[in-house]
Each structure stands twice: as C-alpha cells, then as structure tokens.
Amino acid sequence: MEVILLERVAKLGQMGETVNVRPGFARNFLLARGKALRATEANKKHFEAQRAQLEARNLDRKKDAEVVAEKLNGQSFILIRQSGETGVLYGSVSTRDLAEVVSKEGFTVDRGQFTLNQPIKTLGLHTVPVVLHPEVEVEITVNVARSPEEAERQARGESVTEREAFNLDDLGLEVGQALADAGEGADDRG
C-alpha cells in the first residue's frame, strides 16, 4: 500500500515521501497514529496544499523536543525494586515505569518515547534511549536498586550484587584445625 508520510518515520522515510508499505503496517500504525495518508490523487493534492503548515508544525515540535532534550539528556533516575541476592529483579522495569519516574521529576514524556529492546530485569545502571521527536533522541541513566543507599553506592561505581568474600582467619578459625576437627567427627561416627 502506498502512503504519504506526514512526519519522519525511522527506517522508512522523511516527511512528504511516498513509500510502499504492507497494508497492515499502514492501517494499524501509520494511518492510525496520523503519521501518514493513503497515496491517492486527492490526498497528494491535499498534502501539497498543506505542506508548509505541516513543516512549520513539525519544526515547532522539534524545537520543543530540543528544549526538553537539553534538560533531560544525561539525567539519572532512581527506581527502587525488590530483587534476589544475585541482583535479578522479582519483576521488571518497563517503559510505563520509566515514564512514571521521569514524569515525577517534571518532564513530559510518554511511555512510547522510551526505546527498550527488552524490559530491565537486573539491578544496576542502565542507559535508556528516549526519542522525544523523530529527529531528537537523548539517553538517560536508570539506576535500579533495592534501597536509596544502594542506589548511591551503585552511582559511585560499587557493585551491590557481589557477595563479600570473607577470610576464615578473620573469623578466628584456623583452617587446618577446622578441617581436622571435621575429619575427627567423621571417624567417630564410622
């Protein structure tokens, strides 16, 4: 199905281009979200008549997105979640969670603007791309931790999932003596 793009669409084309796409993609995504028009003669004439207005509106949206991008780029946000000892979350962090935490900080973002290939399922610092406009993309850092104190430690670069190694000598035990005692106990039973 041929459509006329009303805005830049990643991996497809620029505003004003006529592209050939699958009918389902056109109906369910491009046409439904107002990103394209069917490429009929009437729509082509209508688009050319409205082109200047569409370009001006696109430029305004881009400028607004750039203002937000300046403030948002490089920001770090903390998400507190429960996890196991190995750092694997009991749930996951989705785009909805990201939109909620970023909105609480005063930014206007939609969950569809976050680009996650898969949900975040581990503790740690994660870099997440945010597409504010088809031509404006920034990255934020999401610090997923079990507590605010742990988030501070992660921000300093400390690992919170490693088990602390301990020395038996620090516990006041002689390794050889402990092994010998364990061996004697086995002889008494046998």
Curated annotation (Swiss-Prot):
GO CC terms of this entry: ribonucleoprotein complex; ribosome
UniProt record, GO biological process: translation
Keyword terms of this UniProt record: Ribonucleoprotein, Ribosomal protein, RNA-binding, rRNA-binding
Keyword rRNA-binding: yes
Nucleus found in the keyword field: no
Any Pfam family: Ribosomal_L9_N
Domain of life where this protein originates: Bacteria
Molecular function terms, GO-annotated: rRNA binding; structural constituent of ribosome
Function: Binds to the 23S rRNA.
Annotated family: Belongs to the bacterial ribosomal protein bL9 family.
HAMAP family listed in its UniProt record: Ribosomal_bL9
Protein name listed in UniProt: Large ribosomal subunit protein bL9
Species of origin: Methylobacterium radiotolerans (strain ATCC 27329 / DSM 1819 / JCM 2831 / NBRC 15690 / NCIMB 10815 / 0-1)
Organismal lineage: Bacteria, Pseudomonadati, Pseudomonadota, Alphaproteobacteria, Hyphomicrobiales
